[in-house]
Amino acid sequence: MGNFLGIDTSNYTTSLAVYNTQDNSVVQRKLLLPVKEGEVGLRQSDAVFHHTRQLPDLFESLFSENIKLDAVAASERPTQAEGSYMPCFLSGLGVARILSAVLGVPLMRF
C-alpha cells in the first residue's frame, strides 16, 4: 500500500506519524504544548497558536528524508459525539486538507 501520514493537534500535544504498510514501521514526531508555570491547562486560542508554531518544525524533522505519501489523516474533534468541537483540532486538519489537495492523495478524518 504505502505511507500514511497521521496528524493530531489535540489540546496538549502536536503529533505527526508516518505508518509504512510495507514494513509495518512507524516514524513519529511530537511536541508537548507549553503550559505556563502554575497554570492547570491551556485556552484553546493558546493551543491553536502553539500548534501553528510547532507544526512546521515537526514536518521539517519528519520529512528530512524524501517520503512519498499515499494518504493523509487528521483528528478533527475530541470525540465522535455529535457537536464535539475544539478549535485546536483545526490546526492539524487544515494542514492535512492542504497536503491532500496538493499531493492528490486521500484525506481521512478521525
Regions found by a protein language model. Name each.
Residues 1-110:
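Short acidic/glycine-rich loops and adjacent helix/strand connectors
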